[in-house]
Curated annotation (Swiss-Prot):
Domain ABC transporter: 5-239
Residues the record lists as binding ATP: G37, A38, S39, G40, C41, G42, K43, T44
Signal peptide per UniProt: none
Membrane topology, from the record: Peripheral membrane protein
Entries under InterPro entries matching the protein: AAA+_ATPase, ABC_SmlMolc_Importer, ABC_transporter-like_ATP-bd, ABC_transporter-like_CS, ABC_transpr_FbpC, FbpC_C, FbpC_RD, P-loop_NTPase
Organismal lineage: Bacteria, Pseudomonadati, Pseudomonadota, Betaproteobacteria, Neisseriales
Protein name as catalogued: Fe(3+) ions import ATP-binding protein FbpC
Reaction(s) the record says it catalyses: Fe(3+)(out) + ATP + H2O = Fe(3+)(in) + ADP + phosphate + H(+)
Subunit structure of this chain's protein: The complex is composed of two ATP-binding proteins (FbpC), two transmembrane proteins (FbpB) and a solute-binding protein (FbpA).
Cross-referenced Pfam families: ABC_tran, FbpC-like_RD, FbpC_C_terminal
C-alpha cells in the first residue's frame, strides 16, 4: 500500500535555530493523524512545510508516492493536492456559501453539471445545504467552519491539513463541529493531519498520534498504545496525567519508591534506576485492605466537586492529591487504604 503521506528526515531552522529536527512519519490512506505538543514544539511549522508555505532545509515529502519536496524537487503549492481549510472564516466574504465552495474548484462559479453536483454533495456532506445562499457575515463561527471544510474537500484533495481548527469555538459547539468534521472526513475517505494541543481530542478521534517536543517526534502510535505502552516519559506525561516517583527495579518485577514496593511493567534488569509512573485512574480508595496491592494512607482533606471528589492524603512521607469519580465517605484524619490496579510504568534512566 502506497502511503498517503510520507515524511523522511525533514529538518527546518529559522535564523540558525532548529525548529524541526529529523522528522519522519507516514500516513496511510484514509487515516487521521493528530500531531500534538506544547506551544513552540514545531507542529505548525511542520504543517506549513507540508502545505508548501515553508521550505524545509532538508529531507523529503511525498504524497501518494509522488515526491513534492526533496533535495532536487520543490513543487509549487498550486501543483500539490492538499486541502487546507481556512478555519474560522470564509475566504471570499462577498460570495455566497455556494460560490465559496465553488471557489474551491478553481473558478468560483460551478459552471459544469459535474461541478454543480460536487458542490451539492459537499453542502450535504457538511450539513450546510440550507445555507447555500447566505453570505459569510450571516454565518456563525461553527457554520463558517463547515463552509471551510466543504471548500477544502470540493476539489477532492488527497490529504486534508488542519491547524487547531476548533480552538476559536466554545466547548459545546467545538464538540459538535469536531464530531461532524471527523465524520465528514471518514465518509469521504480522506486522510487528514490535525495539529492540536488538546490531548483529549487526539485520544478520542485520532487513528494515530504523533507527540512532538522541541522539534522532534517522541513517539507515533495509536491512542491506546500511546496511553498504555508509551516509549517515552515526556510523551506519556503530555498525553495524560501521571504521578511520578524516582524508583529502582527489583528482580521480582517490582520497584521500590516512596510509596513502597509496587509491581511494574518493565523489561529492564534488576538494579536499574529510573522513574515510576502511575496513572491516577489506577488508584481507588477503601476503608480496609484487600488482596491487591495496598498502600496505607491518612486522609488529609476531601473536597466534593461536580464530577469527582478531590482527596488529599499522606502515604508515608508523600502527600498525594487524587480526583476520584467515586469514593467512600471518609472523615479528615481517618486511616484508609489505596488500592493500585495493575502495574506502574517504569522508564529507565529518567530521573527526577
Amino acid at each position: 500500500m502506497t502511503a498517503a503521506l510520507h515524511i523522511g528526515h525533514l529538518s527546518k531552522s529559522f535564523q540558525n535555530t532548529p525548529v524541526l529536527n529529523d522528522i519522519s512519519l507516514s500516513l496511510d490512506p484514509g487515516e487521521i493523524l493528530f500531531i500534538i505538543g506544547a506551544s513552540g514544539c514545531g507542529k505548525t511549522t511542520l504543517l506549513r512545510c507540508l502545505a508548501g508555505f515553508e521550505q524545509p532545509d532538508s529531507g523529503e515529502i511525498s504524497l501518494s508516492g509522488k515526491t513534492i519536496f526533496s533535495k532536487n524537487t520543490n513543487l509549487p503549492v498550486r501543483e500539490t493536492t492538499f486541502g487546507l481549510p481556512r478555519t474560522g472564516r470564509c475566504s471570499v466574504p462577498h460570495l455566497t456559501v455556494y460560490r465559496n465552495i465553488a471557489y474551491g474548484l478553481g473558478n468560483g462559479k460551478g459552471r459544469t453539471a459535474q461541478e454543480r453536483q460536487r458542490i451539492e454533495a459537499m453542502l450535504e456532506l457538511t450539513g450546510i445545504s440550507e445555507l447555500a445562499g447566505r453570505y459569510p457575515h450571516e454565518l456563525s463561527g461553527g457554520q463558517q467552519q463547515r463552509v471551510a471544510l466543504a471548500r477544502a474537500l470540493a476539489p477532492d484533495p488527497e490529504l486534508i491539513l488542519l491547524d487547531e481548527p476548533f480552538s476559536a469555538l466554545d466547548e459545546q459547539l467545538r464538540r459538535q463541529i469536531r464530531e461532524d468534521m471527523i465524520a465528514a472526513l471518514r465518509a469521504n475517505g480522506k486522510s487528514a493531519v490535525f495539529v492540536s494541543h488538546d490531548r483529549e481530542e487526539a485520544l478520542q478521534y485520532a487513528d494515530r498520534i504523533a507527540v512532538m517536543k522541541q522539534g522532534r517526534i517522541l513517539q507515533t502510535a495509536s491512542p491506546h498504545e500511546l496511553y498504555r505502552q508509551p516509549a517515552d516519559l515526556d510523551a506519556v506525561l503530555f498525553i495524560g496525567e501521571g504521578i511520578v516517583f524516582p524508583a529502582a527495579l527489583n528482580a521480582d518485577g517490582t520497584a521500590d519508591c516512596r510509596l513502597g514496593r509496587l509491581p511494574v511493567q518493565s523489561g529492564a534488569p534488576a538494579g536499574t534506576r529510573g522513574t515510576l509512573l502511575i496513572r491516577p485512574e489506577q488508584f481507588s480508595l477503601h476503608p480496609h485492605s484487600a488482596p491487591v496491592v495496598s498502600i496505607h494512607a491518612v486522609v488529609l482533606k476531601t473536597t466534593p466537586k461536580a464530577r469527582y471528589t478531590e482527596i488529599s492524603l499522606r502515604a508515608g512521607q508523600t502527600v498525594l492529591t487524587l480526583n476520584l469519580p467515586s469514593a467512600p465517605t471518609l472523615s479528615d484524619g481517618i486511616s484508609a487504604v489505596l488500592h493500585l490496579d495493575g502495574p506502574a510504568l517504569f522508564f529507565p534512566g529518567n530521573t527526577l
